[in-house]
Amino acid sequence: TPEAYNQAFAAFIRRTQPGGAVIACAEDAGVRALLANEDFSWIQVLTYGYSEGCAYRIQSIRWNGEGYDFSLFHTDTQKEIGSFRLSVPGRHNLLNAAGAVAVLYQMGLPAAKARASLADFSGTERRFESVCHSADTVVINDYGHHPTQLNLTLEAARELYPDHCLWAVWEPHTYSRTDAMQEAFTVALQRADRVVILPTYAARETAETDTPFQIAKNIPGARAACFDGFAEAADFVAGQAKGLNVVIVFSAGKGPQFASLLCEKLDERRQND
């Protein structure tokens, strides 16, 4: 439940030693609620984000074609820590970068170290990972299996590929998670132009539900479809992906296998065109 989820984070923060510090994202509603409703008075709670009240405030944000140039301002000293370049898209990645810089600064490490590390950072495996691309279609693997992750990744894709048709290929991860977050998944997937829902990755679960079909049905515009197998779904996407397309495969299970199959199907289509 959301309550249990929040309490798990509260318990984690309570493990901080007296006099220690927690660096928290002020742009996350869950974080804000947690800090407002729990007593962490024995530690320093330092926030980062875009807001005026943040201890570490992101400023001078500029899209650089791959990611963002930005600066970070330290409110307590009224000084700019430095300017930084991030070469991966997504405002969530920008926030993560700012949080990392804040931790280093809090530890007394020079901004130059953070600047060099961020400039070289190209992302992590299965996080907005390009699998194959051609002149018109890009296939991306992403480990997203929570509505918030889907939202942020689709937002980043829109920013990076504004002229492409955006596909969300989603492999639901466990029946229980899909049932519990049905409404949130439905809303998140609507950020895409086309939605393909793969068979649920059940993991340890056996009690099947029809929730993925209900999610597809509730996405307006008849732009979502469910499939019983990878081959059928890959054939569908390869046949429908005309013009400029970016296809993001969201999965914490067998998504990489589907992405590889789709790349093969797209290559076959190009050879036959």
Model-derived features with residue positions:
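Acidic, Mg2+-coordinating active-site environments of NTP-dependent enzymes
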Residues: 1-138, 216-223
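Short internal beta-strands
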Residues: 21-26, 167-171, 191-202
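Short glycine-rich anion-binding loops that position phosphate/pyrophosphate groups of nucleotides
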Residues: 28-29, 145, 172-175, 200-203, ...
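Active-site glycine- and acidic-residue-rich loops that bind
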Residues: 141-150, 172-180
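Surface-exposed amphipathic alpha-helices with a cationic face
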Residues: 154-161
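C-terminal helical cap/extension that packs against the catalytic core
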Residues: 186-245
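Short, flexible loop segments at boundaries between secondary-structure elements
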Residues: 200, 265-273
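A glycine-rich beta-strand to alpha-helix segment
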Residues: 233-265
